[in-house]
């Protein structure tokens, strides 16, 4: 939340519905009903600051078997806890990430576009990254292309262009990722999708991560490779400040902003 309001709630909920539809799961509540339940949970938590909100949709109670029809009544779970943002040095100095051996899920096995509760692929990647002392795990897809990070989308900046892998590379359509395209238009910065490979990293002037909880975080190292000058770059900084300047005004309604 920002100022107690769920950030881009409608976009998050739309992605939840789309993900559920991909696995033949129905969210049996309207957007207003879900927002009401989220707001009530935030109120009941009575937190002193901002809240981290997680909405889970399960198939509900039923027999232990592989047939989803055994669980006909979905269960909605809303988790609210205090939000602890990354430390200021994340943005002032940037972070190190690690290219891990764990490959992102094949889209024809478990499509990464589905925002699901099955995070084993991501967790294994983060395990390996932590062994390397890294903030995040950078993952390749089954074709050996850069896809995304375990908990974030990934961008590079090269020759004034902001580049990120296409959805077809097998990535999650991140909410903040999408917002970067909008901010790029506002700032007259070209932002586009393109195939990225490890060989593109030494040529990058800057790199950054995006996620709802991390906002836009500069990446200054990938393992032992220094990105650009080794410090947060001007394009990343412009995008971060544009994000922070507009985050409570986006689309002009409390549900969206």
Where are each of the predicted segments found?
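Glycine- and Gly-Pro-enriched alpha-helical subdomains that act as flexible
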Residues: 138, 145-167, 172-173
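Conserved alpha/beta cores of soluble small-molecule-handling proteins
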Residues: 1-138, 142-145, 172, 182-257
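Secondary-structure junction motif
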Residues: 176-177
């Amino acid at each position: 939340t920002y100022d107690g309001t769920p950030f881009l709630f409608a976009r998050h909920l739309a992605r939840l519905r789309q993900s559920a539809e991909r696995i033949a799961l129905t969210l049996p509540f309207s957007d207003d009903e879900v927002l009401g339940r989220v707001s009530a949970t935030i109120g009941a938590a009575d937190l002193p600051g901002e809240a981290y909100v997680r909405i889970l949709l399960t198939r509900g109670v039923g027999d232990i078997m592989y047939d989803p029809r055994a669980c006909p009544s979905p269960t909605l779970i809303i988790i609210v806890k205090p939000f602890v943002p990354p430390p200021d040095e994340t943005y002032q100095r940037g972070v190190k990430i690690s290219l891990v051996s764990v490959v992102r899920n094949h889209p024809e096995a478990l499509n990464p576009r589905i925002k699901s509760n099955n995070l084993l692929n991501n967790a294994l990647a983060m395990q390996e990254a932590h062994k390397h002392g890294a903030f995040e795990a950078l993952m390749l897809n089954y074709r050996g292309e850069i896809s995304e990070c375990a908990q974030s989308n990934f961008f590079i900046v090269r020759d004034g262009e902001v580049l990120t892998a296409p959805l077809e590379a097998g990535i999650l359509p991140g909410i903040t990722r999408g917002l970067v395209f909008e901010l790029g238009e506002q700032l007259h910065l070209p932002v586009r999708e393109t195939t990225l490979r490890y060989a593109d990293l030494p040529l990058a002037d800057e790199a950054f991560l995006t996620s709802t909880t991390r906002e836009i975080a500069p990446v200054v190292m990938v393992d032992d490779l220094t990105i650009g000058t080794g410090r947060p770059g001007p394009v990343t900084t412009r995008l971060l400040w544009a994000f922070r300047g507009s985050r409570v005004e986006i689309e002009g309604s409390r549900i969206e902003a």
